[in-house]
Amino acid sequence: MKLFVGLGNPGKEYEQTRHNAGFMVIDELAKRWNISFQTTKFHGMMASTVIFGEKVALCKPLTYMNLSGECVRPLMDYYHIDVDDVIVIYDDLDLPPGKIRLRMKGSSGGHNGIKSLIHHLGTQEFKRVRIGIGRPANGQKITDYVLGRFTKEESDAVMEAILRAADACEKAVVTPFLQVMNEFNA
């Protein structure tokens, strides 16, 4: 089973914020695959189906961003999902709005959700789909920026990135991730 994890914060007040780009991709995949989420005992929302002949699961942790690993690790253990079958989708300050970048592994880059996953999974070697949100201007605090909504100027580019990231995830269901990475990072 492949597990796609979108990082974000639960609650209406965080919907459509920069920090919830991962949730937006997961919601797009659920829409494409016509599946609904259910709350799990693992502190997350989960949906599963068979797509292209492969079992897949979508997860949105409900633990708040900096505790994401507390949802994902128990879920992996319960369903016997290997770290090689996990793809994490999240926002990235170091990419401009609308840009996506796929990686096989890496450090947290200062992202608290990724820090939590690295801690709970015991490795940095899990696949990632990063959605660019850019950096704040005019000395705005990073926390305020990531918890803010996209500007009108950013919105179109970011929505395009959400769709492209969902395309990459769909392709990764049956195509080796390195091949998907080479195609979408080009």
UniProtKB/Swiss-Prot annotation:
Its main location: cytoplasm. The keyword Membrane does not apply. The keyword Nucleotidyltransferase does not apply. The record marks 9 as: Discriminates between blocked and unblocked aminoacyl-tRNA. Pfam families: Pept_tRNA_hydro (PF01195). GO terms for cellular component: cytoplasm. Keywords: Cytoplasm, Hydrolase, RNA-binding, tRNA-binding. TRNA binds at residues 14, 64, 66, 112. It is found in: Cytoplasm. It is an enzyme of class 3 (hydrolase). InterPro entries: Pept_tRNA_hydro (IPR001328), Pept_tRNA_hydro_CS (IPR018171), Pept_tRNA_hydro_sf (IPR036416). It catalyses: an N-acyl-L-alpha-aminoacyl-tRNA + H2O = an N-acyl-L-amino acid + a tRNA + H(+). One of its GO terms (biological process) is protein quality control for misfolded or incompletely synthesized proteins. The record marks 91 as: Stabilizes the basic form of H active site to accept a proton. Its EC number is 3.1.1.29. One of its GO terms (molecular function) is peptidyl-tRNA hydrolase activity. The active site is at residue 19. HAMAP family: Pept_tRNA_hydro_bact. Belongs to the PTH family. Monomer. Hydrolyzes ribosome-free peptidyl-tRNAs (with 1 or more amino acids incorporated), which drop off the ribosome during protein synthesis, or as a result of ribosome stalling. Catalyzes the release of premature peptidyl moieties from peptidyl-tRNA molecules trapped in stalled 50S ribosomal subunits, and thus maintains levels of free tRNAs and 50S ribosomes. This is Peptidyl-tRNA hydrolase.
